[in-house]
Swiss-Prot record:
Residues 188-378 form the Glutamine amidotransferase type-1 domain. It catalyses: hydrogencarbonate + L-glutamine + 2 ATP + H2O = carbamoyl phosphate + L-glutamate + 2 ADP + phosphate + 2 H(+). Pathway: Amino-acid biosynthesis; L-arginine biosynthesis; carbamoyl phosphate from bicarbonate: step 1/1; Pyrimidine metabolism; UMP biosynthesis via de novo pathway; (S)-dihydroorotate from bicarbonate: step 1/3. Its EC number is 6.3.5.5. This is Carbamoyl phosphate synthase small chain. NCBIfam families: CPSaseIIsmall, PRK12838.1. Composed of two chains; the small (or glutamine) chain promotes the hydrolysis of glutamine to ammonia, which is used by the large (or ammonia) chain to synthesize carbamoyl phosphate. Tetramer of heterodimers (alpha,beta)4.
Amino acid sequence: MVSLYLENGLFLQVQSFGASGTQVGELVFNTSMSGYQEVISDPSYKGQFVIFSMPEIGVVGANSKDDESFFSSAGILVRHYNEFFSNSRADFSLSAYLKERGVLGICGVDTRSLIKTLRHHGCLMMVASTIEHDKNKLEEILKNAPRISHTPLVASVSTPKIITHQRATFDFKTLDYKPFDEKNSHKTIAVLDFGAKGNILNELQNVGLKALIYPHHTKANELIKAYEKKEIHGIFLSNGPGDPLSLQQEIGEIKQLIGAKIPMFGICLGHQLLSIAQGYPTYKLKFGHHGSNHPVKNLETNAVEITAQNHNYCVPEAIEKIATITHRNLFDNTIEGVHYKNAPIISVQHHPESSPGPKESHYIFKEFVKLLENFPTRE
């Protein structure tokens, strides 16, 4: 059994199918119909519980190859968990996977009702425990826990040292993995790691970019010197968890990088940090965008792209003063992509690498390559 207590006073006792323990986190919902392993292992979900709107979870099991990172969400909530899985690539059940990673698995939940609660109240903090079942004690645990906006999550999911991304990537044409070959790398970029997904790094690699992954607290001067020495040709700012406004030290360094006119590309949290660094702070959405079925309009082509999304914060409309808005969300008209006028920078709020999700926005990685080619390193 697992007991849940939400900050709105809701108390539930339901079934457990994952790890044991007590976890506190922010409750969000995800509308993806598949790809639960990639969601669970996405570093951006660090400190959060994820409700899956898809009622049946577990039917394809899990494996050792599709993880986005070594990090996980606090737990998942599902309507019905199916222990019997069928997939040629599966190595073990979802239950075994959750236990191995220390993730709470919660089933038998009226997920439709909970999602309606979040839509009405917004994201809520929650405590879940397989150990403590007293409502008053759980309420006390939640009361004393820090809010997610006050928790330094990025430091716990960033690389501690500079490493090179060299990973075999899955080829959807051959349905097999192709090894990394440095001969295919035409440019080298620095990745500021705020909690980068593995498949973002894979896509950078697939378009001919060698990715050097730097810690989140890397000083701007170090990157500027590397750019001037032609050791790197540009910078990528990754996705990651938490409130972007809590990263004040990183924002200060990014401001210097913008001033140095280095070509840059940001996704999700990276997109938000680029906005804040130029004086346009983000605001929090009521319940965020989480799922692989969000329509986005490309304002340059008028094409509608179905995208993967995972964020609770958004850049403001005022960003239009210094940037051209390139993409908009068709659910709520929020900004999904910009091209800055004052620097060689592009950024998007959604996830063009998908994983899970459709591949309709993959072209954005090639646009970054074009940006690097149009703004060569200094002589």
